[in-house]
Amino acid sequence: MPDPRQVVLYSRKGCHLCDQVKATLSRLETRGGFTWSEVDIDSDPELQQKFDQEVPVVFINGKKAFKYRMEERDFLRALGAR
């Protein structure tokens, strides 16, 4: 069985789009095939500078896959392609 994809969500508190992406990832995680973690960009000045105006940003296996919005079907398609 292949290793699950690694998904990282870069977000910040008070970001409603981030909350939407988190809800989608939590819902889809039960299907398997990926694990995910969240990084608060405001906890690291370098990340804050890099992603300040782009959150939420989603990386799949180290490659940027989405920023701002992420639809469930697009995520599943991207997950399968990586």
Per-region residue spans from a language model:
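Short helix-capping segments at alpha-helix termini
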Residues: 29-33
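Residue-level recognition of oxygen-bearing side chains
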Residues: 20, 46, 74-75
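Non-catalytic, surface beta->alpha helical segment in thiol-disulfide oxidoreductase systems
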Residues: 60-82
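Local sequence-structure signature of Cys/Sec-based thiol-disulfide redox active-site neighborhoods
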Residues: 1-27
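Structural micro-motif
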Residues: 52-58
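Thiol-based oxidoreductase modules, predominantly thioredoxin-like and allied folds used
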Residues: 34-45
